[in-house]
Amino acid sequence: MPLSTKDSLLVTQFRAITGTSSAEAAKYIKRYKHIEAAVDAFYNNEPAPRADPAQERKLGEIWEKFKDPSDPKLIKIDGTMELCEELDIDPGTDAVLFCLAADLGSKATGEWEKAPFVAGIASYPGNIDSLPKLKAYLPTLRKKLVSDPEYFKKVYNHAFQLARGGPQSLTRSLPLDTAIDLWTLFFPPAFNHSPSALSHLPDNSPPQFTQPEFDLWIEFMQQKNKAVSKDTWALLVDFARGIDKDFKEYDEDGAWPSMIDDFVEYVREQKRGQ
């Protein structure tokens, strides 16, 4: 059941105080009803209420449907493709799969353990306990990804971990082609959305780093032709949200990766030549 207007306001207050996710905040508000009691429970380390047992059972059955026959502790690539087909997700063009990966605790591309899979779906509002209900919730995740800066960064950074091979991988960077594919998946949809996950700081005004600047970034990276480090990947979002249209407000003494320093100089040279 959707939250009432009053409860939605309480969730916003709870998140502002505790820094938790919307789903986690909603669980505390639904259980404790009042902001003071919910915050006290959070800081006293009382767990958020678990999903309804019937919901957990049904979600477990969904996971079982897609688990790998040769490795019954995981859903793997084949099962993920079947899941995507049932949810009408094109994994090559729809970033919502990365939303699910981040929310459902996927540690490697196309792999899902049962417990975080069940807990992740149960954390969504609306008592989702079937594939049709999960499919109906995907537009909400797509909208959240392009409009919520906190959520965008969470999903975007999780995508880096998946693409480099998961937390156990010794690979510390992404091949450039992979990074470009992912940047193209994440950034352009957020540019024209209002509110935007890439809104300009500090006033959350419309983005000033938009498609033309993004195209220059891709052009620059293709000329450099180097793998993309974790720092460059993560800080590109902060850079995009802070830079002005004319690239005049860049803090050259800030702790930016050298790749971003070089990009700023590249753009300034382009602008001087116009």
From Swiss-Prot:
Residues 54-268 form the DCUN1 domain. Transmembrane segments: none annotated. GO terms for molecular function: cullin family protein binding; ubiquitin conjugating enzyme binding; ubiquitin-like protein binding. GO terms for biological process: protein neddylation. Keywords: Ubl conjugation pathway. One of its GO terms (cellular component) is ubiquitin ligase complex. Residues 7-43 form the UBA-like domain. It comes from the Eukaryota. May contribute to neddylation of cullin components of SCF-type E3 ubiquitin ligase complexes. Neddylation of cullins play an essential role in the regulation of SCF-type complexes activity. This is Defective in cullin neddylation protein 1. It comes from Cryptococcus neoformans var. neoformans serotype D (strain JEC21 / ATCC MYA-565). The lineage of its organism: Eukaryota, Fungi, Dikarya, Basidiomycota, Agaricomycotina. The gene is DCN1.
